[in-house]
Amino acid sequence: MLNKIKNNIFLKSTLVLLIGGVIGKLVGFVLRIIVTRKLGAEGMGLYSLLAPTSSLLSVIATLSYPTALSKIISEKSSRTKTLFTSIIPLSIIINIFIIGITILLAPTLSTLLKNETLYFPIICLSLVTPFISISSIIKGYFWGKQNMFPYMLSNFIEQITRLILITLFINKFLSISLTHAISFIILVNAAGEVVSQLVMMYFFPKNIRPSINDFNKNDIKKVMDICVPSTSSKIIGSISYFLEPIVLTNVLMYVGYSKDFIVYEYGVINAYAMSLLLMPQFFTQNMATSLVPELSKYYSLGNNEMCKKRIKQIVLISCSIGGLSTLIITLFPTFFLNILYHTTLGLDYIRLLSPFTILFYIEYPLINALQALGKSKSAMKCTIISSIVRLISIASLSLLKIGMYSLILSIIINLLLSTYLYTKEIKKVLSN
């Protein structure tokens, strides 16, 4: 068994990611508990309202670089040196535009969210994106080489950095205001990304030093050919997620709910219910990451049977992890909420969501599988359909005056639909 693992790069990469993921997630989870306890339901509500904007900016900034670069590097279709020399300048230009546009739109966005206090935190989100972008480019190299240790170690040290900074200074910013504390937490992410980059660069081959002479337009085209359809799918999903709190807040206020109620309950759902139910989701995300280069390689060789085998393995493991964790949390929700967050808020939301939570765990591997199979356009089509349905369901269900249950029900509808669509597309691709 040990010899089999040693000789199987996919298994080694997955195991390294899982072990490193557990360690990194434990630190990240401690950090999340500290932040949640410090900010409270109201603070987490405000922080959660910013999460969709953060997700959208990150998707645009990273442009699916890890997936694209890992695919190109694993197929050995370009020189690594020219890849980095070509992509980094493009990334810098894109991030300058992101910062400028975000600063211009921040007042409008904070007004749409019915919370003008979010103006400065929104600007802080844009200032973090360049650091996230550069990190994603470096990660793409190690993913393509299926060398997951540098990525794992950098992720762990990044979390430790964030934990130390937030533990030391969060109270000082809270004494000023919730807005200052939230802005500080956002900016700490930039410090974590810088530390992560330094760790990964230590493991980077010394012979790869980007030079202006290595700039290659063809490399940009190769990366963009993968990034554009792949990112288009993610951007559509992120735009839907971005519009979620705007649509939800405005429709619920229209039918009579107060702004304070919406912020508070939105915080309860995201900070307590969803956070608890999705605790082990990093397992499936890490496995899906290691799946991309492996699946790309077999698909390029025309080995559909091996592709099916790998996808089935990941989905089976994901279902096992998701099913077991959901069962335990569903049986003892009060215990976990009390011990982790010192609250019992979110119990009803957990009970309603738990039967469908397993779909969260298999959704990410299915999306990555489609992208690895070169079917980013199919993934985009599925995302467009499910995103439109989600927004329509949020708006229409909110009109029924059922409070935040309109959001819960729309999440369930979206999960069922998107899982069905992704599965259908994968079967179609591999049946040819």
Residue ranges and their predicted role:
Residues 26-43, 110-111, 173, 235, ...:
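Helix-terminus/linker motif at the lipid-water interface of multi-pass membrane proteins
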Residues 62-77, 274-302:
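Helix-loop junctions and terminal segments of transmembrane helices
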Residues 9-66, 96-99, 103, 229-251, ...:
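Signature of the first transmembrane helix
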Residues 1-27, 85, 217-237, 241, ...:
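N-terminal membrane topogenesis motif
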Residues 100, 115-137, 165, 187, ...:
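Alpha-helical transmembrane segments of multi-pass membrane proteins
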Residues 146-150, 160-197, 374-377, 387-419:
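Membrane-interface helix-loop junctions in multi-pass transport and translocation proteins
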Residues 97-116, 324-343:
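Short membrane-interface helical motifs at transmembrane helix boundaries
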Residues 131-154, 355-385:
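Membrane-interface junctions at transmembrane-helix termini in multi-pass inner-membrane proteins
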